């Protein structure tokens, strides 16, 4: 059987079958049968099938990969990259929102403010973090963090992975749109360098609120859009079953975003997606973060703001 701890996506069925065959052969080898060469041959075939599959993913397949439950989340990146992390809670206005986490720590010895959506990895944690869909309190907490970071001259890192801001009645009554707008404005107005990374889903204003940064990075199989494919399908076709068609038409992939100038860099994922080797993905992300902040060293507050604003003004003007 394939690795019981690994969740295969629908389009990965050929790879799952090969992995299952490898496991069967290994069991036979463990029982004393000399089939080492056959195991190696099937393993090589499975690896090549996986590489070929992921080299030609459709936008809808990338959407499925971006949502993979075993993909590294905010807490994984923080645990792997940030030392002495001290989380802050609450927006000082209404309460705490566990969907958007943030605090201060050190990245390679230097102070850093880090924040982002946490989807959760288990049923219990997903409910606790509301599947990464932040309420107004989360975005106001983000503003609070950014204000503190600017006060102390600390750079800001955002890790974005959300299906969007929470659309519940309570959230709307407490000013969801205003909170998103203020968070977006706070990002644009920062006098310290900020770097944003879209690690999975970057949907709607809930993502934009944290990604108006000097440098925007995106994982190879992440997606970024003003709306989810399912919602676009319901609006455009009045049919929620056309999500795959919508995704293939919306230009939501990292490659699309790079061509449009929306993101600056694509971070290559391990073969088979970040969920197959989270440790390698986190390490590569750390290198990219270090390079992005290094490129912004030496800029004063005015230059930082000017570069950031011009970056967003220029989006879409030059298509490669």
From Swiss-Prot:
This is Acetyl-coenzyme A carboxylase carboxyl transferase subunit alpha. NCBIfam families: accA, AccA_sub, PRK05724.1. GO terms for biological process: fatty acid biosynthetic process; malonyl-CoA biosynthetic process. InterPro entries: Acetyl_CoA_COase_a_su, ClpP/crotonase-like_dom_sf, COA_CT_C. Acetyl-CoA carboxylase is a heterohexamer composed of biotin carboxyl carrier protein (AccB), biotin carboxylase (AccC) and two subunits each of ACCase subunit alpha (AccA) and ACCase subunit beta (AccD). GO terms for molecular function: acetyl-CoA carboxylase activity; ATP binding; carboxyl- or carbamoyltransferase activity. PROSITE patterns: COA_CT_CTER (PS50989). It is found in: Cytoplasm.
